[in-house]
């Protein structure tokens, strides 16, 4: 189907996943994504420059923590999704050892300095308030960064893993 990555950044995820369309407000990042072949609109997640029901799925990877108004951004994602379209959110769960590590160190991080981390439950609650059907949550990264020596497993659910993938479906 036709997908959109909101907060496409440099196109690091969109390009290998074959997502040709992205939204990114940061000029330098948008330029890098364009070099990877992504059609990037320099816009904000809270005001997407697309018509209603334009996409089969919307992807947001480590983007929700940078949004001024996550609920408004999710409303916009819902608006541009076709009926039964999927929203897929990859996020750092604030309520995990990994998330707490990031929260503590964010002032020293170039990338996460301005981040406002959320818990998976908060994001699921926002999705429910917008009448999305909860499809699935999966989690990984069960240790602090210092303790990880190999690829961490993926498990269903959320609440333990530091990185959570949430998939929810727009009602028909």
Q: Where are the model-predicted features located?
A:
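Short catalytic micro-motifs in class I SAM-dependent methyltransferases
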Residues: 62-65
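A short glycine-rich, Lys/Arg-flanked "PGG" loop and its adjoining helix->strand segment in the class I
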Residues: 71-83
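A conserved beta-strand element that flanks and buttresses the S-adenosyl-L-methionine
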Residues: 59
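Short alpha-helix
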Residues: 115-137
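Conserved class I S-adenosyl-L-methionine
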Residues: 86-115
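Class I SAM-dependent methyltransferase SAM/SAH-binding core
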Residues: 2-47
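Local beta-strand N-terminus motif with an aromatic residue
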Residues: 55-56
């Amino acid at each position: 189907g036709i997908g959109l990555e909101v907060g496409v950044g440099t196109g690091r995820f969109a390009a290998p996943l074959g997502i040709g369309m992205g939204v990114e407000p940061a000029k330098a990042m948008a330029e890098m994504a364009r070099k990877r072949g992504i059609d990037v609109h320099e816009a904000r997640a809270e005001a997407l420059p697309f018509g209603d029901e334009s996409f089969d799925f919307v992807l947001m990877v480590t983007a929700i923590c940078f949004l001024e108004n996550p609920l408004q951004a999710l409303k916009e994602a819902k608006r541009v999704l076709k009926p039964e379209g999927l929203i897929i959110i990859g996020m750092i769960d604030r309520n995990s050892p990994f998330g707490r590590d990031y929260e503590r160190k964010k002032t020293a991080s170039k990338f996460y300095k301005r981040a406002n981390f959320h818990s998976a439950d908060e994001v699921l609650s926002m999705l429910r308030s917008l009448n999305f059907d909860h499809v699935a949550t999966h989690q990984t990264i069960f240790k602090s960064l210092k303790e990880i020596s190999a690829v961490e497993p993926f498990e269903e659910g959320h609440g333990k893993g530091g990185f959570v993938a949430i998939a929810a479906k727009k009602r028909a």
